[in-house]
């Protein structure tokens, strides 16, 4: 059966649906009772409001048969039977649904209307029997044979709907789940195989095995994989990451471990904006980390990697003032540089260790963010501030902040020069302040300006330029 969920208005002309019948079947005097207007005013209210008074389920069911019976229609107060011309066009409404008597052809188990058939007789026939019934299943099972007279039936056969509501085909791999892999013992156990075969999802198609299942070298790297991370190495890797870390104890030649890195707590504090450990003020960050980190981490790195055994190369960038004498006496600098051609001496061993890294190119401090290496820990500390945006050094004059103390020192010199200019400004601004205009009432030959009495450097000023005439 043809179905539709939406309620539509369909204009129908009576003369187009019926066959021509003989004029002598029924008396002519009974024709006036056959013309009825179902909806005298179709524009009043919504379609559902008009249909609520016709039937309990909001639908009109008309079954026109060939026998002559009296007209029996329950009309509401708004729908009164009125005589209408023979070929008058009227509007009817109805709901259509799939007949559930065809199994598999309907997607709705409970249909709204099983069969909807409208038998419309031409005006020359006798008054037809129009019955409104809520149960339409008692109608004729064959809608095409409703009567010997002309019948307009909307129906659709079963084969026309099979392609619309046909069930999906079964999975193509439903019965061959156990034949996908010839030898599943190489990869899965028997229990796993039986469990996977009962899954609802179809398994992937089978492919030929590249190697026999008994080949012990199928995955040669698996047995040796735990050797890369022994338990002792894992404890060292997940231990406290600080400047006093010892050299990597695992004898792995293929695994190269980088030198001591910046503590994650330091980067986390910088990233979250919290104060780093050991800092109490804007200038305490650079002052505390500078002397503390080089003495401890530099000594540990020197002992771990033995930078003295590395070849010493000459410094690519020599000192700006190589012959400048040091302020510290020689006897107070007992640590000379062992590099050939370098006359530098230091009073502390950690200073010598940092200096030797210049010759060896050793950079044991690595940034965890960009993996850049540095030879000094304080250089790494200032470099991390470029990632975190930390600027702990503020200017005392304008409040501008800097990431390095030398940048603040260089900026402070600008304020000092401006202060010197302001102090020398009053002496240079006296001539400009002493130059005054003449009184407006003075004439060209009159007395001198009032500013003539002012003196600069003991000398008296001449008359104003406006009164001075050149010969």
From Swiss-Prot:
Pathway: Protein modification; protein sumoylation
Example GO biological process: rhombomere 3 structural organization
Compositional bias ranges of the Low complexity kind: 127-143, 424-437
Keyword terms of this UniProt record: Acetylation, Activator, DNA-binding, Metal-binding, Nucleus, Repeat, Transcription, Transcription regulation, Transferase, Ubl conjugation, Ubl conjugation pathway, Zinc, Zinc-finger
EC number: 2.3.2.-
C2H2-type ZnF: 335-359, 365-387, 393-415
SUPFAM superfamilies, per database record: beta-beta-alpha zinc fingers
Record's compositionally biased regions (Basic residues): 410-420
Biased composition annotated in UniProt, kind: Gly residues: 280-289
Modified how: Ubiquitinated by WWP2 leading to proteasomal degradation. Acetylated at Lys-246. May be deacetylated by HDAC6, HDAC10 or SIRT1.
InterPro entries: EGR_N, Znf_C2H2_sf, Znf_C2H2_type
Domain of life: Eukaryota
Signal peptide from the UniProt entry: none
Protein's UniProt keywords contain Ribonucleoprotein: no
Compartments where found: Nucleus
Record region (Disordered): 127-177, 273-301, 313-336, 406-471
Function: Sequence-specific DNA-binding transcription factor. Plays a role in hindbrain segmentation by regulating the expression of a subset of homeobox containing genes and in Schwann cell myelination by regulating the expression of genes involved in the formation and maintenance of myelin. Binds to two EGR2-consensus sites EGR2A (5'-CTGTAGGAG-3') and EGR2B (5'-ATGTAGGTG-3') in the HOXB3 enhancer and promotes HOXB3 transcriptional activation. Binds to specific DNA sites located in the promoter region of HOXA4, HOXB2 and ERBB2. E3 SUMO-protein ligase helping SUMO1 conjugation to its coregulators NAB1 and NAB2, whose sumoylation down-regulates EGR2 transcriptional activity.
Subunit relationships: Interacts with HCFC1. Interacts with WWP2. Interacts with UBC9. Interacts with CITED1. Interacts (via phosphorylated form) with SFN.
Protein name: E3 SUMO-protein ligase EGR2
């Amino acid at each position: 059966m043809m179905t539709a969920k939406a309620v539509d208005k369909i204009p129908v002309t009576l003369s187009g649906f019926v066959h021509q019948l003989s004029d002598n079947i029924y008396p002519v005097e009974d024709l006036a009772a056959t013309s009825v207007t179902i909806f005298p005013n179709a524009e009043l209210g919504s379609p559902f409001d008009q249909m609520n008074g016709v039937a309990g389920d909001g639908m009109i069911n008309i079954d026109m048969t060939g026998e002559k019976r009296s007209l029996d229609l329950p009309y509401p107060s708004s729908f009164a039977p009125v005589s209408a011309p023979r070929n008058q066009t009227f509007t009817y409404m109805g709901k259509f649904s799939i007949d559930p008597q065809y199994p598999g052809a309907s997607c709705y188990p409970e249909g709204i209307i099983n069969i909807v058939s409208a038998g419309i007789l031409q005006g020359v026939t006798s008054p037809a029997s129009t019955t409104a019934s809520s149960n339409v299943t008692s109608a004729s099972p064959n809608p095409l044979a409703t009567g010997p007279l002309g019948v307009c039936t909307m129906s659709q056969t079963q084969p026309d709907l099979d392609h619309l509501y046909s069930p999906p085909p079964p999975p193509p791999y439903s019965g061959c789940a156990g034949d996908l892999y010839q030898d599943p013992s190489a990869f899965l156990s028997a229990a796993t195989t039986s469990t996977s075969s009962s899954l609802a999802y179809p398994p992937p198609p089978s492919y030929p095995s590249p190697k026999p299942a008994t080949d012990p070298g199928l995955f040669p790297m698996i047995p040796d994989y735990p050797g890369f991370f022994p338990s002792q190495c894992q404890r060292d890797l997940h231990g406290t990451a600080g400047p006093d870390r010892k050299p990597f104890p695992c004898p792995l030649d293929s695994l190269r471990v980088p030198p001591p890195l910046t503590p994650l707590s330091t980067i986390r504090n910088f990233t979250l904006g919290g104060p780093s450990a050991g800092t109490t003020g804007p200038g305490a960050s650079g002052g505390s980390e500078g002397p503390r980190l080089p003495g401890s981490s530099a000594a540990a790195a020197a002992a771990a990697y033995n930078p003295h055994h590395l070849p010493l190369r000459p410094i690519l960038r020599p000192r700006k003032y190589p012959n400048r004498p040091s302020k510290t006496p020689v006897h107070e600098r007992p640590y000379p540089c062992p590099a050939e051609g370098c006359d530098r001496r230091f009073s502390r061993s950690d200073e010598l260790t940092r200096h030797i890294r210049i010759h060896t190119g050793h950079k044991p401090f690595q940034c965890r963010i960009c993996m850049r290496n540095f030879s000094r820990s304080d250089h790494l500390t200032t470099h991390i501030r470029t990632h975190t945006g930390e600027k702990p050094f503020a200017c005392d004059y304008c409040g501008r902040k800097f990431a390095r103390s030398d940048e603040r020192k260089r900026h402070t010199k600008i304020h000092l020069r401006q202060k010197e200019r302001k102090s020398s400004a009053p002496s240079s601004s006296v001539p400009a302040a002493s130059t005054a205009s003449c009184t407006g009432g003075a004439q060209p030959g009159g007395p001198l300006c009032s500013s003539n009495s002012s003196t600069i450097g003991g000398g008296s000023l001449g008359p104003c330029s406006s009164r001075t005439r050149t010969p």
